């Protein structure tokens, strides 16, 4: 059973202006929940490896009117696969995706690379 994005996001203590990477964003439930918490000065990077899901997510983001969400086609299991700069994220979300990863350590390494020191 998948977890509830809204309830999980509350536990992260997201604040206005934070930068969040959503690994394996899928249809954007976590990205949408984060968007309202980080506000217009924050940014959510919704990263998905499946091109068809990226297109669907881009459509949803537009439909929802979210201006602070960027949809990225990327490989979360490969170094620099997310196309995000080193130590630039306050939070990296890895929900409902780790069990599917073929290279779990690669995924963790990519999250660690983009996470700021002291990030979550």
PLM regions and their residue ranges:
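Conserved alpha-helix/loop element of class I SAM-dependent methyltransferases that forms part
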Residues: 1-18
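Short conserved AdoMet
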Residues: 15, 39, 102, 116
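Short glycine-centered segments of the SAM/dcSAM-binding site in methyltransferase folds
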Residues: 19, 43, 118-120
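Class I SAM-dependent methyltransferase SAM/SAH-binding core
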Residues: 21, 27-80
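A short glycine-rich, Lys/Arg-flanked "PGG" loop and its adjoining helix->strand segment in the class I
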Residues: 35-36, 105-120
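A short acidic, Gly/Pro-enriched loop at the edge of an enzyme's catalytic core
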Residues: 77-91
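A short SAM/SAH-binding and catalytic strip from SAM-dependent methyltransferases
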Residues: 89-103
């Amino acid at each position: 059973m998948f977890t509830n994005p809204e309830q999980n996001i509350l536990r992260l203590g997201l604040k206005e202006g934070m930068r969040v990477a959503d690994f394996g964003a899928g249809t954007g439930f976590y990205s949408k929940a984060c968007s309202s918490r980080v506000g217009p000065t924050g940014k959510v990077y919704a990263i998905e490896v499946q091109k068809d899901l990226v297109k669907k997510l881009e459509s949803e983001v537009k439909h929802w009117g979210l201006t602070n969400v960027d949809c990225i086609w990327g490989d979360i299991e490969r170094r620099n696969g997310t196309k995000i700069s080193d130590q630039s994220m306050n939070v990296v979300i890895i929900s409902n995706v780790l069990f599917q990863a073929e290279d779990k350590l690669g995924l963790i390494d990519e999250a660690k690379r983009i996470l700021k020191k002291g990030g979550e």
